[in-house]
Amino acid sequence: QHTFRPNRSTHQVPFYWTFLLGIMSGMRTNEMCQIRCSDIRKEKNIWFMFVEDSEETRVKTENAIRKVPVHPQLIELGFIDYVVTLKKQKKERVFWELREERDGFASKVSRHFNERFLPAVGVWEKYTKVLYCTRHTFINKLYSEKVDENIIKMLVGHEKEFTMKHYGGDPFTPEVLLEEISKVNYSKINWKKLKL
């Protein structure tokens, strides 16, 4: 717990939230690290994170442009409250502490997770266990819960053209997307001890 929870005064908040976002949204590391406060907003009274291609943000492929419901556990942990506070402070990015480098905004967070956090908790394997594995974990959880494969592809930004070709337009409502992502559950985690 001490290893995982950040010290608010030392710009460590991104280390806390990016891991949680990874296991509960499946977003790519740079997608999480570059997300803007304006990208987190409600649609039909449901909170979403919009992954967009713009002058300020980059996506891996066109398929990566999507919207991901904010998992109820993230809301319970205070993620939306944190974002609302940042909006009041006129912050542009959620993780404003991070600076863009050659490969995007994720370098600092990835180094911390891969070189400090994982070795500290005893699960480090060079080039094998990395922050990006949270995305794989999320996808595996969706499959284990028998979530429709097309919904999985929409949530994680895979093969968007395939989905649209078969269904046309935006086939799944915000309510359906929230219901399906809520099936991702980590029952062995003591969330109360992790809340900031």
Residue ranges of each PLM-predicted region?
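Active/binding-pocket-proximal capping segment
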Residues: 38-50, 69, 87-89, 112-113, ...
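Major-groove DNA-contacting interfaces characterized by cationic-aromatic clusters
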Residues: 72-111
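Conserved tyrosine-mediated DNA breakage-rejoining catalytic core shared by Y-recombinases
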Residues: 34-77
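Tryptophan-centric aromatic hotspots in well-structured domains and transmembrane helices
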Residues: 16-17, 47-49, 79-82, 131-134
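Exposed loop/turn and edge beta-strand positions of beta-sandwich/beta-sheet ligand-binding modules
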Residues: 15, 45, 64, 125, ...
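Short, basic (Lys/Arg/His-rich) helix/loop patches that form interaction surfaces
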Residues: 2-9, 25, 89-93, 101-102, ...
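Catalytic-site neighborhood detector that most strongly recognizes the C-terminal catalytic loop/helix
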Residues: 156-190
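Basic, Lys/Arg- and aromatic-enriched nucleic-acid-binding interface segment
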Residues: 1-29, 33
